[in-house]
Amino acid sequence: MCKTCGCGGGHDHDHVHPHDHDHGHVHGHDHVHDHDHVHDHVHDHDHEHEDVRHVALEQAVLDANDRIAERNRGWFAGRGITALNLISSPGSGKTSLLERTLDELAAAGVPTAVLVGDPYGELDADRLKGRGAYVKQIQVHESCHLSAEQIATELPALPAATKLLLIENVGNMVCPVAFDLGEAAKIALLSTPEGEDKPLKYPALFAAAAAVLLTKTDLAEVLGFRRDDALRNIRRINPEAAVLELSSKTGEGLAAWISYLKQKINQ
């Protein structure tokens, strides 16, 4: 989990409170309970302050990120670049989809760049290189999402002709949603092996998405994936989102996805 952005839910603090006091004699009075009451009250008070500080820190981090994201957004607008933020769980097929996508966009003459977020390594970036697009890996290490500052650092290196920037965020359906990168839109991916209930379990992502890509449709039948339930759950959370069904393996739905990207570029 992220150790710096505050998106980790737990507080890793060890409080050692020796409650068993050996006074050498037994008190037949109620003051021991009074002591416990005061002790508990003090600790409740401490935890309240700790929670307030934690929330304040989280908000400060988000506010700082939002300011940089707005600068990124202005940078994109000034150069006519459409930036899209792809968010999903690990293994949903983001990189496989981008492989097919870059091939199609290169054939169509669309100048494209890709920024790939992963904790470590450059495996995904290596898969995407040589497909007619500028590709750069961003290693986030112990973090669980890309930040606007990390994106800003990479922008000067983008080719001047770039019209579309595809950002493959870290595999996580929670934390990346809160961190605006300056993108024009968030794109959520839901693969058939993940099940139909993910929009209900992770509503923030699907509510924020301009489009939902239902991926790995070639596996739907063998997995017993209930397509109608999945679509109903997506619509329940976000009635306005575009929903595209596709398979990177068979190419099903790929043309509609490329058409969607071209429309976003021209908006």
Describe the predicted segments one by one:
Residues A220-Q267:
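Canonical P-loop GTPase G-domain recognition
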Residues G121-A125, K198-Y202, R226-N233:
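Short, glycine/polar-rich helix-capping loops at beta-to-alpha or helix-loop-helix junctions
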Residues D51-G74, G78-I87, S92, S96-A184, ...:
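Nucleotide-state-sensitive switch-loop elements of NTP-binding domains
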Residues E183-P193, A210-T215:
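Conserved phosphate-donor/acceptor-positioning beta-strand/loop module used by diverse small-molecule
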Residues H11, G171, T192, D218:
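Flexible, active-site-proximal loop/turn residues at the rims of small-molecule/cofactor binding pockets
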Residues M1-L84:
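Extreme N-terminal, non-catalytic leader segments
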Residues H141-E142, D218-A220:
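Short histidine/acidic/glycine/proline-rich micro-motifs that form metal-
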